[in-house]
């Protein structure tokens, strides 16, 4: 079970493609190595488009339309929360839930089925909540998984620049807060994962170092 961490605009998709063979443009949920990709952003962007919302307009919506922003991002369940299959079968996505909340529920169901089959997973997230990662790591290990983390690092300035070119543009203040939270967790993650922790400097897009790929 591999945890990806790095703030918005850090280039996690590029790194996952380089290391694990995941093409972010593909609709499939697996890598060329057979690892299943768990990423609520894919479902989120799909649901945004189904609701007639251009992901590139999120930053503008956050500033200009508080009601719509709430419908998009109101409190959502945590994707990594361990859920048993029996519970998942009874779960239904309520019509009143936010788009982000619905995306996370879809992804949580997907993740639980992968876990039931003990399939290898790449859990793609920002890592801005240390307690969430620690909890999910412990749970994955209780299921028999070995756990690893790839931390994709970049400067705030580069992250902000890339954010403007992403399909889903985040508000500047949210991006900066997330970036700072992730940076504050860097040392904690190193201690948590020990020898199974790798940092990828992605300030400039370039081939991933061989020692990271071999790890």
Predicted features, each with a name:
Residues 11:
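Conserved glycine(s) of the Walker
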Residues 2-3:
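Short hydrophobic/aromatic beta-strand immediately N-terminal to the Walker A/P-loop
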Residues 115-122, 141-146:
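Short, surface-exposed connector motifs at secondary-structure boundaries
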Residues 7-8:
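The conserved Walker
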Residues 156-215:
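Conserved GTP-binding G-domain of TRAFAC-class P-loop NTPases and closely related GTPase folds
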Residues 128, 141-161:
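Conserved phosphate-donor/acceptor-positioning beta-strand/loop module used by diverse small-molecule
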Residues 19-120, 131:
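Conserved substrate/cofactor phosphate-moiety recognition/catalytic segment
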Residues 15:
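Hydrophobic positions on the alpha1 helix immediately C-terminal to the Walker A/P-loop
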